[in-house]
Regions:
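Acidic/negatively charged segments and metal-coordination signatures
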Residues: 1-326
Length: 326
């Protein structure tokens, strides 16, 4: 008979969640809750949904304190009630002209919405958590994610600002959702007479997506229309894009002609820095390109009006490319 004791199995441990895991849980919970808000128009349904979606997060918090399953449920319910009202009041509803349908949160002495019959301040409202940071463009993007592509033109029809649309489109472009960006932004440029410089970012993003989708005719048509805009910033945006198009096909003379016209219209536009260095690089004038890049990086770094970090990084990259080609 073997007298040796059998080895004991290690106790099961709770998986360790990273900050990224927690962010993923929250992001998925928020995204799905927005869908419930749009579909149900029922705060109770949103609370019930969030209670389930946030249970893993509640379990993590409670288990760290040696809590019980009942305490996990109470924690999940408390999170759900607080977050449901904040999400509700920040969610732009398509049928409400992409504005939230505001709903007053429970008063501190009112019965708690969870049904406990206790006062809100003694139940789900007992925490000291600060308000969520829910940027309007992020919430608009969450709502649009629940709409079919055929409805992505609705924000333009409802008067959502070009700046807001550009913020959403920029994220989608980073995610390579080019067709969604085109569906979102194309309606904005049907009537350029209504637009001013606030639409310039959206125009550049749309032209980038046309390029990514190899829709050259659509891009070139937008360039020509921008060049005829009554707004000098939009005209400059069209000319700057024309300069890159001409450079790509080896038309050096017209590339510089378009660049100089754009510079005349908007001499303080930081994006001219990158374009000038690109044109010099395209001609193989690498020494001049490095000199102009150094000049522009100093100018951009000293500019108090704009956050030029992305442009400076892009210029650094162009200089590095030029050095690698030597």
């Amino acid at each position: 008979m073997n007298s040796r004791a059998k080895p004991t199995m290690p106790a099961m441990q709770q998986p360790v969640l990273t900050d990224a895991d927690l962010q993923t849980i929250m992001d998925r919970a928020f995204q799905s809750a927005v869908g419930v808000i749009i579909a149900s128009n029922d705060i109770a349904a949103v609370i019930a949904h969030l209670r389930q979606a946030l249970r893993p997060l509640a379990a993590l918090v409670v288990n760290e304190q040696g809590g019980t399953p009942a305490e996990i449920e109470r924690a999940a319910q408390g999170m759900a009630v607080r977050l449901a009202y904040e999400l509700w009041n920040a969610t732009p509803i398509p049928e409400n002209h992409f504005r939230p349908r505001k709903l007053a949160p429970p008063e501190r002495n009112a019965p708690c919405p969870c049904g406990s019959q206790r006062k809100y301040k003694q139940c789900c409202g007992a925490g000291n958590e600060g308000p969520l940071i829910l940027p309007p463009d992020e919430m608009l993007g969450r709502v649009l994610d629940h709409l079919p592509r055929t409805r992505l033109g609705e924000p333009v029809a409802q008067g959502i600002s070009p700046h807001m649309l550009a913020l959403v489109a920029s994220r989608w472009c980073d995610e390579q959702r080019f067709d969604d960006v085109i569906a979102l932004l194309e309606p904005l440029f049907i009537d350029l007479g209504k637009l001013d410089e606030r639409a310039a970012d959206a125009a550049n993003i749309l032209m980038n997506c046309y390029l990514a989708r190899q829709q050259y005719d659509a891009r070139n048509a937008l360039v020509e229309r921008l060049k005829k805009s009554h707004n000098r910033v939009l005209r400059s945006a069209g000319l700057q894009r024309e300069a890159t198009v001409c450079s790509d096909r080896g038309d050096v003379r017209n590339a510089w002609r378009a660049f100089n016209e754009a510079r005349h219209l908007t001499p303080d536009d930081p994006s001219l820095s990158h374009l000038e260095v690109l044109l010099l690089r395209a001609e193989g004038r690498d020494i001049e390109a490095r000199e102009r890049a150094d000049y522009w990086m100093a100018v951009l770094a000293a500019d108090p009006r704009h956050d030029n970090r992305a442009l400076i990084e892009a210029l650094h990259a162009l200089v590095a490319e030029a050095a690698a080609d030597d």
